[in-house]
């Protein structure tokens, strides 16, 4: 058997992040993240609530109870708390903070400011955002 097109490592790990994103139970968006060091996955995660808690899609998230269109005009969307952790946070927790130094994190969407801060705190050396190229942390 001849392999005509073998995916690059970045493509491979980004696909793994996409698979993790599909596990998300958020009613608004599905995001996945994978922390990789020396071509080995050391942590993975998706946005979601803690194990054993009521999932967002099952009505467990106060923020997810309203669609964007249902939020009253002039109201701050952030007044309703999100009860889940973001994919990046879950992946770093799964890897262990100390293990993340110098690693690469693959995410399916651009990290928010809090996740960017966490990525920097974890000393992750490289961030790869799905479909958007490579961005240094």
Region spans (language model):
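Zinc-dependent deaminase catalytic domain
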Residues: 1-137
């Amino acid at each position: 058997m001849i392999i005509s097109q073998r995916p690059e490592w970045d493509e491979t790990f980004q696909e793994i992040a996409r698979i993790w994103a599909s596990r998300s139970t958020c009613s608004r968006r599905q995001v996945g993240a994978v922390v990789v060091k020396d071509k080995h996955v050391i942590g993975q995660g998706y946005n979601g609530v803690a194990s054993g808690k009521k999932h967002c899609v099952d009505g467990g998230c106060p923020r997810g109870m309203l669609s964007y269109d249902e939020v009253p005009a002039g109201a701050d969307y952030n007044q309703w708390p999100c009860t889940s952790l973001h994919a990046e946070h879950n992946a770093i927790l799964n890897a262990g903070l100390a293990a993340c130094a110098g690693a690469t994190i693959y995410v399916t969407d651009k990290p928010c400011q809090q996740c960017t801060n966490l990525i920097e705190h974890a000393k992750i050396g490289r961030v790869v955002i799905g479909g958007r190229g490579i961005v240094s942390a």
